[in-house]
């Protein structure tokens, strides 16, 4: 017979008694997720977080969360061209019960990418790292496909290696010129209608006709130091008055009055 303490009897409790089940959602709060002012739909959803308890602050648990939203939902549009483009927004600050987000990247859905790849054509891709005027380092990926000439009797529309290199150079030059002279707000406004890809398609017509040209992905590699005023301005809440301040005239020997108590 083994000698030892019977833990069940020493505690004086009955074996098999169930513990009181506490619903974990009673310790959580809902917060509204706000998109920047570049998008039509400002409130994109809600998120849960544990309430502030001791040293664990609720707002710190929210910062850094990434939300992936379809462009069709952000623009409140049922257009099919917007539904396959996803924008990533990262939570940077919490004001009351509102989570303020900023642009964190863009991507195409997998089904859209797979549907574009077909036989008898050349796939051309390019990527480049570009820094915006406000200090964001972005890695931009572009994709395009050669288009068959309607007058041609050939089944295929393959581009030569020299033409592929020229088209790739055009892609890099157009992306660099469009983003390097703009801040993040202007870049996002260009990504929403995909105007950069349309400019690339027009610029490459003289080399080889293209179709299905898209900015496939945008990654945010580096960000400038966080400033709350710039984030509030991005959300349309930090704009000051346009009126200049009034100049106050004081005599040269002016001294402030001495306060009796501090």
Curated annotation (Swiss-Prot):
GO terms of biological process kind: translation
**SMART domains given in the database record:** Ribosomal_S3Ae (SM01397)
Pfam families to which the protein is assigned, alphabetical: Ribosomal_S3Ae
Please list the residue ranges that the record marks as compositionally biased, kind Basic and acidic residues: 235-253
Region ranges (Disordered): 235-262
Q: Name one GO cellular component term.
A: cytosolic small ribosomal subunit
**Per UniProt, which keywords does this protein have?**
Cytoplasm, Ribonucleoprotein, Ribosomal protein
Cell compartment(s), UniProt: Cytoplasm
Q: Which InterPro entries match?
A: Ribosomal_eS1, Ribosomal_eS1_CS, Ribosomal_eS1_euk
Q: Which GO terms describe its molecular function?
A: structural constituent of ribosome
Q: Which cysteines are joined by disulfide bonds?
A: none
Tell me the subunit arrangement.
Component of the small ribosomal subunit. Mature ribosomes consist of a small (40S) and a large (60S) subunit. The 40S subunit contains about 33 different proteins and 1 molecule of RNA (18S). The 60S subunit contains about 49 different proteins and 3 molecules of RNA (28S, 5.8S and 5S).
Family designation: Belongs to the eukaryotic ribosomal protein eS1 family.
Please name the HAMAP family in this protein's record.
Answer: Ribosomal_eS1_euk
Protein name per the record? Small ribosomal subunit protein eS1
Its source organism is Triatoma infestans
């Amino acid at each position: 017979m083994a000698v030892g303490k019977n833990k069940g009897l020493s505690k004086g409790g009955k074996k098999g008694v169930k513990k009181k089940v506490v619903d974990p959602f009673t310790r959580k709060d809902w917060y509204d997720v706000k998109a920047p002012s570049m998008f039509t739909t400002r409130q994109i959803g809600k998120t849960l977080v544990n309430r502030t308890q001791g040293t664990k602050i609720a707002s710190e648990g929210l910062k850094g969360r990434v939300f992936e939203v379809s462009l069709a939902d952000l623009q409140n549009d049922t257009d099919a061209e917007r539904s396959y483009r996803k924008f990533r927004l990262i939570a940077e600050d919490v004001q009351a019960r509102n989570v303020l987000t900023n642009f964190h990247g863009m991507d195409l859905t997998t089904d859209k990418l797979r549907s574009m790849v077909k036989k008898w054509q050349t796939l051309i891709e390019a990527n480049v790292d570009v820094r915006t005027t406000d200090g964001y380092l972005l890695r931009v990926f572009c994709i395009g496909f050669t288009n068959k000439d309607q007058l041609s009797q050939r089944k295929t529309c393959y581009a030569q290696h020299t033409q592929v290199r020229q088209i790739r150079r055009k892609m890099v030059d157009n992306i660099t010129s469009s983003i390097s002279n703009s801040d993040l707000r202007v870049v996002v406004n260009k990504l929403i209608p995909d105007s950069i890809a349309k400019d690339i398609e027009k610029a490459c017509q003289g080399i080889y006709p293209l179709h299905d040209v898209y900015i496939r992905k945008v990654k945010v590699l580096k960000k400038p130091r966080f400033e709350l005023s710039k984030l509030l301005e991005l959300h349309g809440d930090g704009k000051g008055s346009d009126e200049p301040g009034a100049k106050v005239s004081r005599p040269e020997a002016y001294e402030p009055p001495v306060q009796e108590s501090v």
